[in-house]
From Swiss-Prot:
Organism: Thermococcus gammatolerans (strain DSM 15229 / JCM 11827 / EJ3)
NCBIfam families, sorted: PRK00630.1 (NF001884), PRK01002.1 (NF002169), PRK02967.1 (NF002815), PRK04460.1 (NF003381)
Domain of life per record: Archaea
Cofactor detail note: Binds 1 nickel ion per subunit.
Cofactor(s) required for function per UniProt: Ni(2+)
Protein name: Putative nickel-responsive regulator
Keywords of this entry: DNA-binding, Metal-binding, Nickel, Transcription, Transcription regulation
Transmembrane portions of the chain: none
Sites where the protein binds Ni(2+): 78, 89, 91, 97
Function per UniProt: Transcriptional regulator.
GO molecular function terms attached to this record: DNA binding; DNA-binding transcription factor activity; nickel cation binding
Family affiliation: Belongs to the transcriptional regulatory CopG/NikR family.
GO biological process, one term: response to nickel cation
Amino acid sequence: MGVVRFGVSIPEELLEKFDRIIEEKGYVNRSEAIRDLIRDFIVRHEWEVGDAEVAGTITMLYNHDEADVVKELLDLQHDYLDEIVSSIHVHMDEHNCLEVVIVKGKAKRIKEIADRLLSLKGVKHGKLVMTGTGRELV
């Protein structure tokens, strides 16, 4: 894998802000920060396309005392056995549980799974975090 050097013209004020941020985040140089931005751009594009193979996590916080929420969560997860790779269940306190579902598949299908899980009555908060499978990144 070769490395290509290229130039970018941007306003000075924008570059100064960028330099401050990459220093705060601990980047050793602009190149690595720009590579990360490009990788993120590629991953987001893969998700937008909808038919790309992607991965992600669906995190849900819910009250297990809420009527039928546990049964509905499990039933829905069993509807997507091909896409759900694993799940982690954590008891936050005597009523609240945190569940992280690890998913892999077509972006459109993963979004569908997240929408269905996160919209269940009893799910207090949730989020889909998207990434790629790694094959599309260098």
